[in-house]
Swiss-Prot record:
One of its GO terms (biological process) is galactarate catabolic process. It comes from Shigella boydii serotype 18 (strain CDC 3083-94 / BS512). Mg(2+) binds at E154, D180. This is 5-keto-4-deoxy-D-glucarate aldolase. Pathway: Carbohydrate acid metabolism; galactarate degradation; D-glycerate from galactarate: step 2/3. The record marks D90 as: Increases basicity of active site His.
């Protein structure tokens, strides 16, 4: 069983090596369901702080529930804001998914928010959960180089600036938000539209051109396999909420219809 902090960051190393990482989205915001999810064998799990009802008080027990799991926890922050990111760092997250990044400057801000000076602007606390309350002697030396930053492109401006974003130092992966991207391109609710699919493939290709892996959420198996064929290495193939809803509906239908 691993304890905090986890150095070196194996998830960051796997992404850098372009090793396919299959994951699952978590939106149920409950430590029991998260613990069960952590036993399933996924490479990583996103604990969603943007669209799921999560905050510091719900994230901490979920991180505790994943202690000993082989699945790397990734937090999607609600917004690209340094204070929010600092607080999530202090409770023990090392892998960050930053939503709605549209420019190189926004990508740089995300990176800076996770690094201690002089590399960044992260505020300093000498005793918090991530450094085992001050008992890890080399935490400051190790932390900066063990943070993973995944930036989410989900707008036309983000697509237009994908090269600059992907080239940003400290950005580890380019992640596509297919639903918001579809809406931004005029196809709300239809991420399968050819225009959206073309944009997704373009993002993957440009990320690869800059030596960065790409990722996406794809709960439909055919979509996930297509994105893997296109070169995505960081793919969420479902969500705990979706699996729970589908399984319970199927169970009810088996006996009620």
């Amino acid at each position: 069983m691993e304890s905090l902090p986890v150095f070196p960051n194996k998830f960051k190393a796997a992404l850098a090596a372009k090793q396919v990482q299959i994951g699952c989205w978590s939106a149920l915001s409950n430590p029991i369901s998260t613990e069960v999810l952590g036993l399933a064998g996924f490479d990583w799990l996103v604990l969603d702080g943007e669209h799921a009802p999560n905050d510091i008080s719900t994230f901490i027990p979920q991180l505790m529930a994943l202690k000993g799991s082989a699945s790397a926890p990734v937090v999607r922050v609600p917004t690209n804001e340094p204070v929010i990111i600092k607080r999530l760092l202090d409770i023990g997250f090392y892998n960050f998914l930053i939503p709605f990044v549209e420019t190189k400057e926004e990508a740089e801000q995300a990176v800076a928010s996770t690094r201690y000076p002089p590399e960044g602007i992260r505020g300093v606390s000498v005793s918090h959960r991530a450094n085992m309350f001050g008992t890890v002697a080399d935490y400051f030396a190790q932390s900066n180089k063990n943070i993973t930053i995944l930036v989410q492109i989900e707008s036309q401006q983000g697509v237009d600036n994908v090269d600059a974003i992907a080239a940003t130092e400290g950005v580890d992966c380019i992640f596509v938000g297919p639903s918001d991207l579809a809406a931004a391109l005029g196809h709300l609710g239809n991420a399968s539209h050819p225009d959206v699919q073309k944009a997704i493939q373009h993002i993957f290709n440009r990320a690869s051109a800059h030596g960065k892996p790409s990722g996406i959420l794809a709960p439909v198996e055919a979509d996930a396999r297509r994105y893997l064929e296109w070169g995505a290495t960081f793919v969420a193939v479902g969500s705990d909420l979706g699996v729970f809803r589908s399984a319970t509906q199927k169970l009810a239908d088996t006996f009620k219809k």
